[in-house]
Structures are given as structure tokens and as C-alpha cells.
Amino acid sequence: MNENDAVRKATLRARAEIDLGALRANVRSLRAHASGAALMAVVKADAYGHGALACARAAVEAGAAWLGTATPQEALALRAPGAGIPADVRVMCWLWTPGGPWREAIEADLDLGVGGMWALEEVTAAARAAGRPARVHLKADTGLGRGGCAPADWAGLVAAARAAEAGGLLRVVGLWSHLACADEPGHPSIEAQLTRFREMVAYAERQGVDPEVRHIANSPAVLTLPESHFDLVRTGVAMYGVSPSPAIGAPADFGLRQVMTLTASLALVKHVPGGHGVSYGHHYVTPGTTTLGLVPLGYADGIPRHASSAGPVLVEGKLRTVSGRIAMDQFVVDLGGDEPPPGAEAVLFGPGDRGEPTVEDWAQAAGTIGYEIVTRIGSRVPRVHVNDANDANDVNDARA
């Protein structure tokens, strides 16, 4: 069996097609929104379910100077031999727990987020053991109430970082924070956080900290809050063409295109009489004689059970709705009088060009956010990356 046959057979049941041309175009659009700030492409959680290495490479090709991850393991994978990430691209990680691989991260030339005294002590010890200084971004909690140093503890953290810097153990290259409500335009916490961030940055600089970058803007802030851009912006979900929230607007409003298209092949098509119960609990009963199609994807694949009897699916050009409960491996759609053959394509979501549902449609059906829809697509669904930089038929990239 050759490689093409293997890919074809692996994707017979379902596939998540990842349009790298669209991703590159999105990065360029976001850079245009970024007011001259550098762009960090956030590829945590396997690039929000899209495939971290392929998406990281595509983002860099489109001008991303930084890559961001949550865990150090994710960041180390980007520095592994064969990853294909240029050495001059900065890679930052920020979600640490005590005893983490600080030394490995320092030796891999990663940028390290530090938001508390315990973390500063561990990174300092690791730098001493590694025999080289760490690159550190001090994180301030400006109001999110999650990671980062509380304002009351900021002076102590800054003083300790300056002492370690004077000892040659680290370099404070960044000061940063994260916005709580940037996806709610006009929320009073936004200006309050920006004000506090400016104050905490100014204090650190008065103490002698000379950061290369200051950063607080996430995807919604990149799109709607130019005053938050500072030196570096962090683009996550918007890079994948998914709206941060309905209040922000549709991706197309900002020149963005959805990157992932999720499809499956109908596993079974059959006729049933009226009054026939469908799936667990018989929450759907056929209103009359009809045709049912079995879609071989379920909540084990990340299809949200909360979208039972609500999730939209395009089958042979017609929009259908999940009929009854979504099960672990499969769900059913009522096809009415249509009779597509087994193997016919069911499109769960895509950019919307062919009338198919979008990620936002599924988020609404499940009562959740687009972030969750794409990041939950499971490992049983192969990712097929198309329109890479060397593809002469890269229509999306040529349009940008």
C-alpha cells in the first residue's frame, strides 16, 4: 500500500481538512490589524486541534515572529530536530507547575512565562544548572484573576527578577498580562486592565527592567482594541478563522477564513416508517416514512452531545439537522425523501462557501464557543493539511 492509499483509507470514515493557505492569509490579515506590533501565533492544544507543527510552520511563513504554547512540552516539540521552525523564531510557553522542565526549556532557547516567586526561584536554579541565562516574561495579573502576579506582590517579584538578572541568571525580556473580557466590547474591565498593565509595566521599568516586548492583546483585542497592541500581539482562535465571540463579529468581517472543514462519509442509509424512534432515548421519532443517514462521528470524536437534535449538517447540498441524541461514535440525520448512497459526504462545518454550517453554527447549537468545537475534535479524525507553501494550486494563498 503506497502512502496515498494509506491516507485515503485513513480518511474514508471522516477527515478534518486544514487549509494552510487560509491560515497564512489569516496571519497576514491579523498582522495588518496589529498596528505594527509583532505577532505571536498561538499553537497550544495542537494548534487548537489543527495540527501544531504544520500550523506553526505556515504561520511563520506568513510573518509570525513568535510562537506561543501553554505547556513546556508543547514548546519543546517545536524546537525538536526536524520540526522545521527557524531558530530565529521565538517560542514562548507559560503554563508551568512546580518541578517542570525548566532546564530543558532554557537549553532549548525557549522564552518562559513567570507569574510567581516559586517559578522565578525554579527558573533561576535551572539557569544556574544550565550555565546560561533564561529568557523570562514576568506576568502581571491585571484583573483576570487567573495566572500572573497579583499587584500586591509585583514589587517583590520585580526586585527578585532584577537581582537574578544582575547575577547573570536571567534576562527579563517581556512584561505581559491577559485580558478577561476583550470579547465583550465596551466591558469596563478592559480599560481597567489596560490602565493597571501600564502602571505595572511603568513600575518595573522604573526599577531597571528593560523589556524587549510588552504584550496583553489576545485575538479579540487584536481585532478591536488597537490601544492594547503594545509591542507584541498574541493571536489564537482568530488565526484559525474562528470568531472569538458573536459580539465581535463574523470572521469575514475581519478578512479571516475558517481553516478547518470537518466531513464524514455516510456509513448507512435506510428507509424507516413513521413513528420510528431514533437513537438513545428516542428523543426523535420520525414524523412519517423517511430515509435516515448514519454519520460515523460521535462525542468520542469531539462532536458535542449538547448539540443533539440541533447540530447542522450538509448532505448533498441540503442542510439537515442531527436527529436525536449524538452517541459516542455516531449520530443520525433524517434525510426526508432524499436517498444519497452510502459513502456520500456529510459536511459538519467549513468556511460556509458551499452553504455548509460553520464552527460558529455548531457552537450555537451546543451552547458553547467556537474554541471548544475545534479543539475537541479527537485523534480518531485524521488531519489532512492542504495548500502548503509549496503547492502551486494554493488558491487561498494566491488571493491574499
PLM regions and their residue ranges:
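Active-site anion/phosphate-binding pocket segments in diverse small-molecule metabolic enzymes
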Residues: 1-24, 28, 32, 74, ...
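Active-site-proximal beta-alpha core segment in soluble small-molecule metabolic enzymes
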Residues: 10, 14-17, 24, 37-215, ...
